[in-house]
Amino acid sequence: MPSLDWKLIAPVAVAAIGGLAFATYFAAQPAAEQAQAETTVEVAEAPPALDKAQINAAIREYLLENPEVMLEVQDALQEKQLAAQREDQAKAIADQKTAIYDSMADPVFGNVDGSATVVEFFDYNCGFCKRAMADMVTMIEGDPELKFVLKEFPILGPDSEAAHHVALAFHDLYPEQYPQFHLRLLGFDGRASDESAMRIATELGGDEAEIRARMDDPSIGERIRATYALANELGISGTPAYVIGDEVVSGALGESVLATKVANVRECGSTVC
């Protein structure tokens, strides 16, 4: 059975069950008293205040007899919160459409003029991102009209940040070799770092002095900070995360799930038709 989040649902339960107790109290009054109340119009008396202990007892009794109500309340609250989050994310996507889909600073795989776009926020040290790399490759190979944008989003410590600085500098200097660099570093068994990223960069023909000079350019750090800000606005806090159409998709959900969402965007403009 799912665990209950009492901090979320206790206030709701108190209000709901309190109302039930209030109604139950008056429903239990003798029929004669109810009849008298209905026929007596001259005197209007306020109903007696319910004792707090009575309310608490009624709530406790109801919850013990109907514990499934708490799961229903929790599910309803979570669904309401998710709906609000999706609405906020859709608005953020609309407001930041150019920065998300068409930033000239971002590496792009596939067809730069494709009819549909997938945007991925990733970290080179993210295990699920490594697993999801095959999904990207499969989708691009099977869909010549797909544009795949990569958002360098180092969130897993200083090693990740250093590796992404190397990656962005390499992309700026050697854009033709960047796809090989990306696949090799993301597929690397060890930890991505300045050292491992630079080793791959030089093996692909990059000049370390030029790369380090480019890494020192303030624009590299500014681009990463801009990605952090964009992720925050979209409610993205983990990797991998995707933006497809008007939806933020979190987690390595697999090629078939992503491809279905792309197909729906082409068909009706939304990930769900």
Segments the model singles out, each with a brief description of its role:
Residues 2-56, 60, 202-273:
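C-terminal cap of thioredoxin/glutaredoxin-like
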Residues 48-101:
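Extracytoplasmic c-type cytochrome modules immediately beyond a signal peptide or single-pass transmembrane anchor
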Residues 49-53, 64, 116, 127-130, ...:
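Soluble non-cytosolic domains of exported or imported proteins
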Residues 64, 75-78, 183-187, 202, ...:
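Short amphipathic alpha-helical surface patches that mediate protein-protein
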Residues 98-116, 140-141, 273:
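A short beta-strand-turn-helix
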